[in-house]
Amino acid sequence: MNVHKKPSLKLIAIILVTFSVATGCKKSEEKKQEIKKQETVYASDVIPFFEHWKLILGDGTNVGVPLNFENKDYFYTENDGENNWVVFKAPNGGNTHGTSNNTRTELAQLKKWYPKTANEKMTATLKVMNVSATGDETVAATHSVVVGQIHSADKHENEPLKIFYKIYPGHKKGSVFWHYEINTKGDDNSGRWDFSTAVWGHDFSIVGPSADEVPDEPKDGIALGEEFTYEVEVKNGIMSLTFKSKGHETKTFTKNLIESEYLTKADIPKQTQELFFPIGQDGVERKNAYEGEGCFFKLGAYNQTNGKSPEVNRNWCSGAETFNGDVAKQYKTGNYVEVWFKSGSLKISDKVVSNEGYFSKNDKVK
């Protein structure tokens, strides 16, 4: 006869405790995962305007509207102990967007507007954390990054505004300057050129005396990691710019976007004649400049340093290190740009229209 003993109260207690511990551990792990998920801070949590943009990554891809999105190579958030920041990062070499030679991690506005009827505004507060460690010091674009733009979506797709930050190796202070690029007259855009205006520090034209020698450091420049703010407003054809930074003089500028001042070669500034004429960029501008062309804002990190030989273009081709596009090696050796944005805003009028044509034309990886 088989005798079945009832489990002792002690054994039952052990089983219950074991089950309870196992269940508790599982719930604890699930809770940790949930907390971790909740603690992820996205760019759209930091600056609440991302529904108005598409995002181009440093590998040339357009990821669309970047709500609740991050990419640890190019676009994510950081906290510096006081504030959350949106990080834009792009290597010297890799796949690019559209026809550009340069990589970017950059927002592009979903809508476009026309300068003559515009009432648009973009603002941003940022700090540049890194520019390329290498590049030919006689090339004006070397060690620079564009952190804000107005871009044309039509015809030549030129840029009435690019806001630059540039700092040379060994310098404590860098320069902030802005460019106006002409909207070249006619169908041939090869003669296009930029005019550079200093905000703090030097303008674009100040370069090293040789490929491995840097120029003098600017006295009133902006350091890596130092905050500054820009405000860009376009209203009734006039672009107004304001630049602010603690401890620096506030600077303001205006530029007419619908009436050119560069109708003949005699009108072209001396800076441009010295910088661009030697490489064949000596065009003149349409009389009405950017009137009638759809324009839009851009914001982020548009790397101006690349690996192309300076023999191709003495102003824009840096001959910098790219490790054949190996992003990890570029990041490890300082051959990239990194820009942190703390805040930003976008004012959009009721005159805007879809910018989808620009994206459909340029959304390809080279």
For the regions a language model picked out, list residue spans one by one.
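Ligand-recognition surfaces built from glycine- and aromatic
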Residues: 47, 119-121, 133-137, 221, ...
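Short tryptophan-centered beta-strand motifs in secreted/extracellular beta-sheet-rich domains
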Residues: 122-124, 226-235, 239-243
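Bacterial N-terminal signal peptides that target proteins for export
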Residues: 2-12
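Extracellular carbohydrate-recognition regions
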Residues: 36-69, 355-366
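Bacterial Sec-dependent N-terminal signal peptides
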Residues: 20-40
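Short, aromatic/His-centered strand-loop micro-motif at the edge of beta-sheets
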Residues: 181-228
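Secretory/extracellular carbohydrate-interaction modules
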Residues: 75-190, 365
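Bacterial N-terminal signal peptides
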Residues: 12-20
